Swiss-Prot record:
GO terms for biological process: sensory perception of sound. Keywords: Actin-binding, ANK repeat, Cell projection, Coiled coil, Hearing, Repeat. Residues 458-469 have a biased composition (Basic and acidic residues). The lineage of its organism: Eukaryota, Metazoa, Chordata, Craniata, Vertebrata. The keyword Coiled coil applies. This is Espin-like protein. GO terms for cellular component: cytosol; stereocilium tip. InterPro entries: Ankyrin_rpt, Ankyrin_rpt-contain_sf, Espin/Espin-like. Residues 355-383, 458-480, 611-643, 692-729, 764-794, 951-975 are annotated as: Disordered. Interacts with MYO3A (via C-terminus). Interacts with MYO3B (via C-terminus). SUPFAM superfamilies: Ankyrin repeat. The gene is Espnl. It comes from Mus musculus. Expressed in inner ear hair cells. Expressed in utricle hair bundles (at protein level). Expressed in choclea (at protein level). Residues 502-539 form a coiled coil.
């Protein structure tokens, strides 16, 4: 209570209250506000010199006390323009003249920024350096240019004239800042009197004209274009001109004036016009101005969006409707256009004189009516339009086609219409002599004429010619369009440049052979059915049962894969007799053929081609004939293959992350201290539990194995604090970052590439292994899932279908996010980024954060982490993602989503920096219980529903992308999946990548 009274008294200059509090001993240096400003700060800001003297001299409060941002009372005096307080603090209170706060701002910077010329003059006279820079590289001259005070600017340029063209760390010069703030008189002074360079650009490529146009400073734009040599076609790094910036900001007068001054309509680097920018931001007047200058509203940017599309996407329905209405052609009555120059009669007269002069009376020439229409008989256009032709957008492409014809017509040249010429006119185009000067027989000439006639689309030969003459006239136009072999290209070329190479022909031949083979197989289908019926009638019932249910056949114990069937004869050749199953009487050789036939047909009909390797079966004993190194773990080549499939470089990641000299406990070879329960070390790390023995070749665990993956060497409560941790705990944070990068990188790569490419490669490898046949029968081969395992296999197919459908939905969603939205988010300077900002807008606004589903959250984070984030923010976002996915199984999606929101809100409000960590928030949401809270089967806690029927797009083999883009909203949350199922998949995937990280970063130790 007394502290609050002291602050109020200092602001109001209440000396009586201050004396009473001083006598009571209540005036202490620790009395500050929320920003760390003390009593002397508040008295100085208010301009109460007597209070300042009382607090410093009698209450003995420090005159140079710093707030949280490092500002002293001297900074407050300079900012508020209190010269008397500033003089006393510097001369009598022991404050420094050039004290800088945490940003490097000095009193001279603040005096110039807030336009106090008396303080600027006094500080310069007292010896304050005009060359002092802030951490951003700003001089006091830059701050004066922002303030707009001409006197301050003149004082500072006189003190430091060489700083006129000096730029800050972002590339801003004093002239750029003056134009950005709209100070015309300062810009004129800098250019005329100080010689400032108008061609200087910021780091993003923006010039002074761009800055003035972007902020709507009309007079400054006109002055720059009129009285400086700055160009109207100047572009920034993204190809935007001053028209783009004016349209983006909705500055219609500037837009109209620039167009009247001759500014061309140009596309930016991504194909956008100023109309795109105006429509995107809903500036209808700018759209109207651009349309009045004949900008084409149907132009598309590189994303395929028109201005109407962008207006609808951002929720500007009125602007979109206006663009639609203005784009419709309106029929109006028009008078006939004026005659061309020269007039048609004069043109016809000139042509006739030239014909007489040449003396070519025997050659029939085109009439004037064919070349140029006669003006009096010119018809009225059928559908005249109200708007003229759209203004052409400046592109580097050359003029083509109709534009060239229109230009020639305007120049008075008649366009030669070859398709309207009679056959006699084409006769002149065929020479009478060949290249050697020998005469060409007339019948050959006529053949050439008719070929040319057919090629140019002229009429057929006269009907009075007989059939033989027509046959001699050469091939028709349809015959001319056949494909031909080109010696130059060594390929077959089509009439439009189509290319058919030898490889294409080989592929087509193979396809034809496959079709022929399929036809022959269909012919034998009925015969196979008849033979199968005979076998069932002749053979005893148990034998039929044995051939269908191949688990009754002897097989190699411990190996369960799907690559090839296990035959009885093969087992007899490779195993001892005692290794067979207890049922184990060896069957005759011919039974193996029946088993192979039934199994091959089952695989063919069921479609089981290598996708059932995720069968969740307990590990079986490893065959004794395998080497010990196979049992101990994967070979080096096998591990390297798996690492390549992960898409990461282990050595690079380790070099980037592991800087500390010590290794974590999970990687140490020595045992932990005695007395600690298994799995935990005294240093706080949770070691990896013994992993179950899997495939003898050390392959990756299948989809079923990941469900029971345990916490691999790290717990969610591993470190009490990220800030100020020791080397061991820093390594724990690095492990968290690695896990998150592997986890998110895997999902991102799967979403941005063809779905499940690795599984397809494995399927191809399995098919090749099966095609090798008997030569691989010497070693025990794992068996495929039997046809009787259909329900479990269908469950695996259903899981695969859900993931495929999820990835396809992600691709469909990202296809509807304009690239300009992602670019502008990546350049955003203020406020923290959030995943929903990177998703398609719903009704013109981003998706509400509280309605985000887990899959949309991940999709947004993929793009968020692509932005150019500061190093500390990127690190803490990785750690934040780790906590989100780590606690997903135990607390549910709603809880971890609220936790993420709480952390980002704290940072956005300025109450917390990224480097401060978030352990207190984590304890508030998830508690502070020690030990790994990981559940072996987190799906049970989530209450996962049984897998139901999938949408059509999610079935394997169908296209992963839905035909209609999903609509994001709070009702469906942009997802057609069960929320619990998706959380279960993501949770188990995160557990798998924790295991994978432990395996990968233990490689080669």
């Amino acid at each position: 209570m007394e502290a609050q009274q002291a602050l109020v008294a200092s602001k109001d200059g209440d000396m009586a209250t201050l004396e009473r509090l001083f006598e009571a001993g209540a005036l202490r240096p620790d009395i500050t506000d929320d920003l760390g400003a003390g009593l002397v700060h508040h008295a100085t800001r208010a301009g109460h010199l007597d209070c300042v003297k009382f607090l410093v001299q009698r209450a003995k409060l420090p005159g140079n006390q710093q707030a949280h941002n490092g500002a002293t009372p001297v900074h407050d005096a300079a900012a508020t323009g209190n010269l008397a307080e500033l003089c006393w603090l510097v001369r009598d209170a022991g404050c420094g003249l050039q004290d800088q706060d945490a940003s490097g701002v000095s009193p001279l910077h603040l005096a110039a920024r807030f336009g106090h010329p008396a303080l600027v003059e006094w500080l310069l006279r007292e010896g304050h350096a005009a060359t002092l820079e802030t951490l951003e590289g700003a001089l006091p001259l830059h701050h004066a240019a922002v303030s707009g005070d001409l006197t301050c600017l003149k004082l500072l340029t006189a003190a430091h004239s060489s700083g006129v063209n000096q730029r800050t760390c972002s590339g801003a010069s004093p002239l750029y800042l003056a134009c950005q703030e709209g100070h015309l008189h300062l810009a004129q002074f800098l250019v005329k009197d100080c010689g400032a360079d108008v061609r200087l650009r910021a780091l993003d490529g923006m010039s002074s004209l761009h800055a003035a146009a972007a902020h709507g400073h009309y007079s400054l734009v006109v002055w720059l274009v009129t009285f400086t040599d700055i160009g109207l076609t100047a572009r920034d790094n993204e190809g935007a001109t001053a028209l783009h910036f004016a349209a983006r900001g909705g500055h219609t007068p500037i837009l109209d004036r620039l167009l009247l001054m001759g500014a061309p309509i140009m596309r930016d680097s991504w194909g956008g016009t100023p109309l795109h920018d105006a429509a995107e931001n809903g500036h209808m007047e700018c759209c109207q101005t651009l349309l009045s200058h004949h900008v084409d509203p149907f132009l598309r940017d590189e994303d395929g969006y028109t201005a109407i599309d962008l207006a609808e996407y951002h929720g500007h329905q009125d602007c979109a409707q206006f663009l639609r209405e203005m784009s419709r052609p309106v029929r109006v009555l028009m008078t006939p256009p004026p005659p061309p120059f020269p007039p048609p009669p004069l043109l016809a007269a000139k042509l006739s004189l030239e014909e007489e002069r040449r003396g070519d009376s025997g050659l029939k020439s085109p009439s004037s009516a064919t070349l140029s229409p006669v003006w009096p008989a010119q018809p009225v256009p059928r559908e005249p339009m109200a708007c003229t032709a759209p203004l052409r957008v400046t592109t580097p492409d050359a003029l083509q086609g109709p534009e060239v014809e229109a230009r020639d017509s305007r120049a008075g040249l008649a366009t030669l219409q070859l398709d309207g010429l009679p056959a006699g006119d084409l006769d002149m185009l065929v020479p009478t002599q060949d290249e050697r000067g020998r005469p060409i027989p007339e019948w050959k000439r006529q053949v050439m004429v008719r070929k040319l006639q057919a090629r140019l689309g002229a009429d057929h030969p006269p009907e009075d010619q007989d059939q033989s003459q027509r046959q001699d006239s050469g091939p028709t136009a349809a015959e001319q369009a056949t494909w031909r072999y080109s010696q130059t290209h060594q390929a077959i070329l089509g009439p439009f440049g189509e290319l058919l190479t030898e490889d294409d022909l080989v592929y087509l031949e193979k396809q034809i052979n496959d079709l022929q083979l399929r036809r022959r197989c269909q012919e034998y289908e009925s015969e196979l059915g008849r033979l199968a019926a005979q076998l069932q009638a002749l053979l005893p019932e148990p034998l039929v049962s044995i051939t269908v249910n191949s688990h009754f056949l002897p097989r190699a114990p411990g190996l369960e894969d799907e690559e090839a069937p296990v035959l009885a004869t093969e087992l007899e050749a490779s195993e001892e007799p005692g290794k067979a199953e207890p049922r184990g009487q060896p069957l005759p050789f011919w039974c193996s053929h029946i088993g192979r036939l039934v199994r091959s047909m089952s695989l063919l009909l069921k479609g089981m081609n290598g996708l059932a390797q995720g069968e969740e079966k307990p590990p079986s004993p490893v065959p004794q004939d395998l080497g010990k190194e196979t049992i101990a773990g994967p070979s080096r080549s096998e591990a390297q293959r798996e690492i390549q499939e992960c898409g990461v470089s282990v050595r690079t990641l380790r070099g980037n992350f592991e800087f500390a000299p010590d290794l974590p406990c999970a990687l140490n070879s020595g045992p932990c201290e005695l007395g600690v329960r298994p799995g935990q070390c005294l240093r706080g790390c949770w070691s990896a539990p013994p992993q179950p023995r899997g495939d003898a070749m050390g392959g990756e665990p299948g989809p079923g194995d990941t469900e029971e993956a345990s916490d691999s060497g790290i717990s969610c409560e591993e470190a009490p604090s990220e800030a100020g941790a020791g080397p061991g705990l820093d390594l724990a944070s690095l492990r968290k970052e690695r896990i998150v990068m592997l986890f998110l990188g895997h999902w991102k790569k799967s979403a941005y590439t063809p779905a499940l490419r690795t599984a397809a490669c494995r399927t191809l490898e399995a098919q090749r292994a099966r095609s090798r046949g008997p030569e691989a029968a010497g070693s025990p081969r794992p068996s495929s899932p039997q046809p009787s395992d259909g329900p479990r296999l269908g469950h695996l197919w259903q899981q695969r279908g859900i993931i495929t459908h999820l990835l396809g939905t992600w691709k469909a969603i990202m296809a509807h996010v304009p690239a300009r939205q992602l670019r502008r988010l990546s350049r955003r300077e203020r406020g923290p980024l959030s995943p929903e900002q990177f998703l398609p807008h719903v009704d013109g606004a981003p998706v509400p954060y509280n309605s985000l589903s887990l899959d949309l959250f991940m999709l947004g984070y993929f793009q968020l982490l692509e932005c150019d984030l500061p190093a500390e923010e990127r690190k803490m976002r990785h750690l934040l993602c780790f906590e989100v996915f780590e606690h997903l199984g135990a607390h549910g999606w709603e809880a971890v989503r609220a936790f993420h929101k709480a952390v980002t809100d704290e940072v956005a409000a300025g109450r917390r920096a990224w480097t401060d960590g978030f352990e207190d928030i984590k304890a508030r949401f998830f508690g502070s219980s020690q030990g790994p809270p990981w559940d072996v089967e987190p799906g049970r806690k989530l209450g996962l529903t049984p897998l139901g029927s999938l949408p059509h797009a999610s079935l394997p083999g169908s296209g992963p992308e839905p035909a209609v883009p999903p609509r994001l909203g709070s009702d469906s949350q942009g997802s057609s999946f069960n929320s619990g199922d998706i959380c279960g998949y993501i949770d188990r995937s995160f557990a798998f990548w924790k295991e994978k990280e432990a395996e990968m970063f233990n490689f080669g130790e």
